[in-house]
C-alpha cells in the first residue's frame, strides 16, 4: 500500500486473530491499523507475533491524549506471545506515523520532546499471580483482573508463564490517558510470568507511564525509560520481579517548566490498608509487591527554579522494595518518599524480615526525603536513617549523563551473583563510565 507518500505493509486485526505472523526485516515498515490482538485469548487460539531485527512498526493515526477512537495499539493476551527479536544496530521500533510518513502527509507535523500519546502502546497479559482479587481464592480460575484501556483480562496461577520475548526494542510516543482511572502506558506487563524474556528495552515520550507492572513475576534487564508524562516505572498488584541495569531519564519540559514525568518510580501494592497479613474475603493471603532492583540510575535534565517539587521514588500502599547498587541524582527534587505506615513497617527496623531496604545506594538530591504525600508513614528522620544503612549514603554526584564518575565508582558494589538472574558487577549504578554505555547502537539518545 501507499501511505502518506511512502510504501508500507498493513497490520490489521484479521492478520493476527487466527494465525502466526512474522514481520520480516530489511524491507518496508509496517503500519498498525487499529487495535491489534495476537490470538483470541484462549489456549486453543494462541498465536505469536514474531518481529525480525530492524523492523519499524508505526501508528496509522495520531489521535492524541484522551481520544478513544482511531487508537492503534497491540495486545498480547494470555497464552499468546510476542517475539520482538531486535539486535544491536537493528532494534525493533514501535513509533508514531509522524516519524515515518513523508512531509506530504496530514499528520507529519514535526516531532518535539513533549509529544506523547500518538498511539496506544503495548500490553502483555499473562497467567502469573496478582493480588487484585477480592472475589475468589487467590490464583483460582475466577481470580482475574481486567486491564485498563479495554486491554483484556489477566492473572492466574503460573508464575512461570511465558508471554514471549523483547530484545533491543524501542517504544516511542505511545500511551493514552482516557481519564484518571483508565490509561494505557508505553508498555504494560499485566500478570506476566518469569519465563518471559525482557532485555534491552527503551520507552521514550510515553503518555502515563513508561513501563508499568500489574502483578506477575516477570524480570527484566537493560531498561531505558525517557520522558514519560507520568511515572517512568510503576508497579502495583503484587509484582515480584527483578530488574538489573536500568536508566530513568526525567526529561524537562521547557515550555511548561516542569518535568515531563511525575516520578521516576511510583510503587503501589493493593491499597492503603494492605499489610503482610492481609487476606481477601475468602481468607486467602494476598501477595504483596516486592521487586528487587540492582544497578539502577535515576537522572534528569537541568531544572528551572520554579519546577514542581516531587521525589524520585514514591513507595506506598505496603509495597516492598529491595534496592541495590543504585544511583539517584535529581535536583532540586527529593530522592525518596515513603507513604503509609504499612510500607515503612516493611523496613523491619531490626524487628523482623526486611522487605524494604537500600544497599549501596548513592543519593544525590537537594534533600534525601520530603514529608509524606498523604501525611502517614515514617518521619523524615526515620526515612533518612533507613536510606543511609547498608553502605548507602548521600553525596555529590559526578555523573556524565547517566554514566558514573569518580564519586560513584568509589563505592564498592555488592555482589548479587549468588542469585543466577543478576550479573556480577564491580560498580553501582547502571553504567560505570562512557565506554561502558550499553544504550549505544540501538537506543535513542535523550540528550539529542
What kind of feature is each model-predicted range?
Residues 57:
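Active/ligand-binding-proximal structured segments within catalytic/core domains
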Residues 1-46, 60-81, 86-87, 91-208, ...:
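Extracellular beta-rich repeat passengers
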Amino acid at each position: 500500500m501507499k501511505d502518506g507518500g511512502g510504501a508500507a505493509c498493513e497490520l490489521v486485526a484479521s492478520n493476527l486473530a487466527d494465525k502466526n505472523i512474522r514481520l520480516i526485516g530489511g524491507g518496508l515498515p509496517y503500519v498498525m491499523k487499529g487495535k491489534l490482538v495476537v490470538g483470541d485469548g484462549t489456549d486453543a487460539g494462541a498465536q505469536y507475533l514474531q518481529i525480525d531485527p530492524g523492523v519499524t512498526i508505526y501508528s496509522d493515526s495520531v489521535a492524541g491524549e484522551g481520544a478513544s477512537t482511531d487508537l492503534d495499539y497491540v495486545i498480547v493476551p494470555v497464552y499468546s506471545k510476542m517475539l520482538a527479536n531486535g539486535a544491536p544496530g537493528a532494534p525493533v521500533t514501535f513509533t508514531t506515523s509522524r516519524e515515518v510518513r513523508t512531509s506530504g502527509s496530514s499528520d507529519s507535523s514535526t516531532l518535539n520532546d513533549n509529544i506523547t500519546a500518538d498511539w496506544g502502546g503495548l500490553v502483555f497479559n499473562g497467567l502469573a499471580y496478582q493480588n487484585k482479587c477480592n472475589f475468589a481464592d487467590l490464583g483460582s480460575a475466577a481470580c482475574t483482573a481486567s486491564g485498563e484501556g479495554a486491554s483484556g483480562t489477566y492473572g492466574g496461577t503460573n508464575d512461570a508463564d511465558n508471554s514471549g520475548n523483547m530484545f533491543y526494542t524501542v517504544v516511542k510516543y505511545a500511551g493514552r490517558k482516557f481519564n484518571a482511572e483508565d490509561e494505557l502506558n508505553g508498555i504494560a506487563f499485566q500478570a506476566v510470568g518469569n519465563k518471559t524474556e525482557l532485555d534491552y528495552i527503551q520507552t521514550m515520550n510515553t503518555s502515563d507511564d513508561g513501563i508499568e507492572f500489574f502483578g506477575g513475576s516477570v524480570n527484566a534487564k537493560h531498561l531505558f525509560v525517557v520522558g514519560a508524562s507520568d511515572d517512568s516505572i510503576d508497579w502495583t498488584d503484587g509484582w515480584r520481579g527483578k530488574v538489573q541495569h536500568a536508566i530513568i531519564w526525567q526529561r524537562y519540559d521547557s515550555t511548561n517548566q516542569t518535568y515531563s514525568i511525575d516520578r521516576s518510580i511510583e510503587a503501589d501494592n493493593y491499597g492503603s490498608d494492605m499489610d503482610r497479613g492481609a487476606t481477601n474475603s475468602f481468607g486467602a493471603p494476598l501477595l504483596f509487591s516486592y521487586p528487587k532492583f540492582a544497578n539502577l540510575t535515576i537522572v534528569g535534565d537541568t531544572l528551572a527554579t520554579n519546577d514542581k517539587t516531587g521525589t524520585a521514588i514514591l513507595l506506598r500502599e505496603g509495597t516492598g522494595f529491595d534496592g541495590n547498587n543504585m544511583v539517584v541524582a535529581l535536583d532540586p527534587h527529593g530522592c525518596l518518599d515513603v507513604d503509609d505506615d504499612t510500607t515503612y513497617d516493611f523496613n523491619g527496623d531490626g524487628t523482623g524480615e526486611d522487605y524494604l531496604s537500600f544497599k549501596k545506594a548513592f543519593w544525590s538530591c537537594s534533600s534525601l526525603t520530603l514529608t509524606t504525600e498523604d501525611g502517614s508513614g515514617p518521619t523524615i528522620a526515620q526515612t533518612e536513617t533507613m536510606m543511609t544503612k547498608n553502605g548507602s549514603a548521600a553525596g555529590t554526584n559526578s555523573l556524565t549523563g547517566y554514566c558514573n564518575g569518580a564519586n560513584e565508582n568509589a563505592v564498592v558494589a555488592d555482589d548479587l551473583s549468588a542469585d543466577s538472574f543478576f550479573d556480577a558487577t564491580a560498580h553501582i549504578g547502571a553504567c560505570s563510565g562512557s565506554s561502558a554505555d550499553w544504550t549505544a547502537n540501538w537506543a535513542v539518545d535523550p540528550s539529542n
